[in-house]
Amino acid sequence: MKKNLFIAFEGVDGSGKSTQVKLLTDSLKKSGHKVYSTCEPTDSPIGSVIRNIFKHRIEADHRVIAGLFVADRLDHLLNKTNGILKKLEEGYTVITDR
């Protein structure tokens, strides 16, 4: 069984992660690879809550925010529709911006 790649770009805000994800995604697609690119926080309902907290500077306990990030990461990994594991099983190289 062929194993597919999961590639994560990590760094501080503004360090070029999204740019690198796009460049690598485009390059691999041009080479004929199936590629699924994603980011965290995700676009899921949980990810939207996280984004709103930071966008609107909503005060929240750091433990609550950490719990939301954990929940978003688990959904990102295990989601039966578009989760990382599902996409790897479908033969995609998965590239994420964290």
List each model region and its residues.
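Phosphate-binding P-loop
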Residues: 1-4
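Hydrophobic anchor at the beta1->P-loop junction of P-loop NTPases
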Residues: 6-9
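Hydrophobic positions on the alpha1 helix immediately C-terminal to the Walker A/P-loop
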Residues: 20, 24
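ATP-dependent small-molecule kinase phosphotransfer cores
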Residues: 33-98
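Walker A (P-loop) phosphate-binding loop of P-loop NTPases
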Residues: 14
